[in-house]
Amino acid sequence: SMALVNNDLKRILAYSTVSQLGYMFVGVGVGAYSAGIFHLFTHAFFKGLLFLCSGSVMHALHGELDIQKMGGLYDKMKITALTFIVGALAIAGIPPLAGFWSKDSILHHAYVSGHRGIWLVGTITAGMTAFYMFRLIFLTFFGKPRDKHLVEHAHESPLIMTIPLIVLAIGYILVGFAAILPNGGFEGFVNKALVLREVGGHHEEEASFLIILSVVVALIGIGIAY
């Protein structure tokens, strides 16, 4: 919740890490061990991408972190902006990105295992995450510059900084397909190494409902941020 009102670029990302770690612990707590590990795996990609993007913004603005002073950076930093948006969509849980599959798998297991309270908190948290991440995106890259002197000299970062952003963004998009590979995808692969049996079965109707609800909640969060 601290990220909802914070204006420090790096602190918002740091606070978001806490909630994502919470999802991992929820996964383990409800018996969805492979889902928790999958979220750890996907989180490494999108959080690495987000922090590198924030570093690119800092480089362009001489270390400035206050997003209330930014705005209008999209036209000056298209690569950074687009890769930042990929990371934000990922952490918000928008399909078909991997963050959607890993987070929704955890929430689905929480629901079908009877932990409805935990599922509800996780779903609300997903909406909050979408809100504060896109609040950051809109304040940083869109609208008019709120500090014209700060923004007027901004420029895209050099290739040595933007190439890793592109590689991570493309890699992260490809990681999303790990969830839908044959034999259970990533989770099926992890399950082979787990001795403990996971809880939760295959409930197609419930799964479809939960997926739709999760996406709607995330889109509402993005809409409120806009």
List where the protein language model places each region:
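Acidic/proline-rich low-complexity IDRs
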Residues: S1, A193-V195, I212
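Hydrophobic transmembrane alpha-helices and their helix-loop junctions in integral membrane proteins
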Residues: S1-S157, A169-G171, F177
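Serine/threonine-rich low-complexity intrinsically disordered regions
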Residues: G72, T80, D147, S157, ...
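Intrinsically disordered or highly flexible coil/loop and linker segments, enriched in small
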Residues: P95, R146-D147, A179-N183, I222-Y226
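Membrane-interfacial helical/loop segments at transmembrane boundaries in membrane proteins
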Residues: S102-H109, L181-E206
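Glycine- and aromatic-enriched alpha-helical transmembrane segments of multi-pass membrane proteins
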Residues: T162-V175, H203-Y226
